[in-house]
Amino acid sequence: MAVKIKLTRLGKIRNPQYRIVVADSRTRRNGRAIETIGKYHPKEEPSLIEVDSERAQYWLGVGAQPTEPVEAILKITGDWQKFKGLPGAEGTLRVKEAKPTKLELFQAALAQAENEPVGEAITPKKKKAKAEDAEAAADAPAEAAAESEAADK
C-alpha cells in the first residue's frame, strides 16, 4: 500500500484550515486517514504550523511520500532537512509573539494612571450651566414686559 502525507481541508469558505495526515494514496482529499500528525492554519499571522516531528520522521522513514505542500511545510519546520540529513535542521518557522498577561496589562494601566495630572475638571459642571439657563429664561420675560410697556407709552 502506497502511503502519502497530505493535507485535509477543514474550516469555512474563506478561512481554510488543514490537518497534516498520513493516508493511503488512493483515498480522496478528505477521506479516511491513518494518522493525523499536525495542523496548518495559513490565514493566521504568522501561519500556525504544528507538526509532530517524531511521527513525521517515522512515516518518512517507512516510505511515506509527502505531497508538495506538505514537503514545503516540513522544510519550514526543519523535519525534511532532519530526514534528509541536510544542514539547517532548525528550519525557518516564525513564532507568534506572546500576548501580554493580564497582570502586565494591569501594571501598565496603574503606571499610566499615576502619571496623569491630578487637578480639577476642565469642563464646567452641568448644574451650574442649568442654573445659568434658568436665570436667563427668568430675565427674558421681564425684559420683554418692560419693552412692551415702553412701546405702549
From Swiss-Prot:
Alphabetized Gene3D superfamilies for the sequence: 3.30.1320.10
One GO MF term attached to the UniProt entry: structural constituent of ribosome
Region of interest called Disordered, as start-end residue ranges on this chain: 114-153
One GO term (biological process): translation
Family: Belongs to the bacterial ribosomal protein bS16 family.
PANTHER family: 30S RIBOSOMAL PROTEIN S16, SMALL RIBOSOMAL SUBUNIT PROTEIN BS16M
Protein name: Small ribosomal subunit protein bS16
Gene field: rpsP
